[in-house]
Amino acid sequence: MFQAAGAAQATPSHDAKGGGSSTVQRSKSFSLRAQVKETCAACQKTVYPMERLVADKLIFHNSCFCCKHCHTKLSLGSYAALHGEFYCKPHFQQLFKSKGNYDEGFGRKQHKELWAHKEVDPGTKTA
């Protein structure tokens, strides 16, 4: 059924009755790579090669690659990603415009709050 990539090898074999030798033809066996099972980042099920899609180094089923907001099926040319979440371009723009920045528009704490002024010790001088 399958043929090996290499030529057949001749291997000597001893005849059980007379101790004579004969030649047995064996084909080189081809190695089957152990395939790593890849799982979909959205549904955590096995992804087979025909349904595999990679976006931002994450693996998805074609059908699982959807907008987080409206669940529309996305393609590699029609998505925008932020913080590991995927959006269709219209919703990405709509959510971004609603607050005017990435953090608030997508329900996160504003980055500037992380840099809020801390209380300064009254004994220290500031320039």
Curated annotation (Swiss-Prot):
Entry keyword Cytoplasm: yes
Subunit structure, interactors included: Interacts with ILK.
Positions annotated to bind Zn(2+) 2: C67, C70, C88, H91
Main location class: cytoplasm
PROSITE patterns registered for this protein in UniProt: LIM_DOMAIN_1, LIM_DOMAIN_2
N-acetylmethionine PTM sites in chain numbering: M1
Additional detail: May play a role in tumor progression via its ability to activate the ILK protein-kinase activity.
Induction annotation: Over-expressed in breast, bladder, melanoma and thyroid cancer cell lines and tumors (at protein level).
Location of region: Disordered: 1-24
InterPro entries in alphabetical order: LIM_LIMD2 (IPR044115), Znf_LIM (IPR001781)
LIM zinc-binding domain boundaries: 38-98
GO molecular function, one term: metal ion binding
Official protein name in the record: LIM domain-containing protein 2
One cellular component (GO) term of this entry: actin cytoskeleton
A Pfam family hit: LIM
Binding site for Zn(2+) 1: C40, C43, H61, C64
Gene that produces this protein: LIMD2
Localization per record: Cytoplasm; Nucleus
Annotated function: Acts as an activator of the protein-kinase ILK, thereby regulating cell motility.
A GO biological-process term: actin filament bundle assembly
Keywords associated with the record: Acetylation, Cytoplasm, LIM domain, Metal-binding, Nucleus, Zinc
